[in-house]
Amino acid sequence: MGLISYENEAINEVKKADNHHVSKFVTSYYGPSSSSWQSGIWILFVLFVAAVILIILFTFVANRRRRRMGRAPIRGTAWLTPPSYRQSQQQYTGTVQQRTDDYVPEYTETANEHDLGYYDQRGEFHPNDKAAYVAPPPLVQECSSESVNSLERPPAAVVHQANSLDTDYGLTRPSNGRVPAVSDTVEQLERLPGGTTTQEINPPERAKVNARS
């Protein structure tokens, strides 16, 4: 109170000394209609609006996240959540008062017209006589008539030789019961039935001379 009274006394003294010529300037500077006071009010208003917008955005994001998790929105903020399909459709068409038909078929004790049947309490399936029979698709034949009447020759069949068990990759098996061993000598190999002969192996130098000749 002392500071305010001191300012008022100073203003009155200035008015008396200056013959009330500066009264308008002093009143505009110290009065409630000054430019600094108005700018402060606008700054507070802008900060308040920004805080409200941030709170609304945060609530919208939180409700959207809770809806994805299957939880209810925050109490009192359900109007911030996006509308459901049926709700948005009613708002678009303007048929809020008119009751729309449910997309889910009505549950009855017996099978509906388009149901194939139903299961009883014991788990046995009972077909519905009212359901229309749908024929299965026709079977696809492996060999059509076009391939039979075509002029293309089929691939040759693979025929195995009668003695395929005795020959394998050009290797012959001896007809006798005894198989030559590595430790057998030349004389023992010659005594074996079948006339087993030995093959002469030429050294590398002699093989080169034979190849040139």
UniProtKB/Swiss-Prot annotation:
For side Lumenal, which residue ranges? 1-39
Which sequence ranges are marked TM in the entry?
Answer: 40-62
Described function: Regulates chitin deposition in the cell wall.
Q: At which positions is motif PY motif?
A: 104-107
Give the multimer and partner information. Answer: Interacts with PMT4 and WW domain of RSP5.
Name where it's found: Endoplasmic reticulum membrane
Residues annotated as region Disordered?
A: 190-213
Instruction: Please give the name of this protein.
Output: Protein RCR1
Gene Ontology annotations of biological process type: cell wall organization; chitin localization; protein localization to plasma membrane; vesicle-mediated transport
Q: Keywords of this protein's UniProt record, alphabetized?
A: Cell wall biogenesis/degradation, Endoplasmic reticulum, Membrane, Transmembrane, Transmembrane helix
Instruction: State which ranges are Cytoplasmic (membrane side).
Output: 63-213
Q: Which InterPro entries match?
A: Chitin_synth_reg_RCR
- Phenotype when changing P105A: Reduced interaction with WW domain of RSP5. No interaction with WW domain of RSP5; when in association with 82-QA-83
Name of the gene this protein is made from? RCR1
Membrane topology category: Single-pass type I membrane protein
Q: What does the record's free text say on domains?
A: Transmembrane domain is required, and the cytoplasmic region conserved between RCR1 and RCR2 is also essential, to endow resistance to Congo red. The PY motif is recognized directly by the WW domains of RSP5.
Q: Where is the composition biased (Basic and acidic residues)?
A: 203-213
Q: Name one GO molecular function term.
A: protein-membrane adaptor activity
One Pfam annotation reads RCR
What Gene Ontology cellular-component terms does the record carry?
Answer: endoplasmic reticulum membrane; intracellular membrane-bounded organelle; plasma membrane
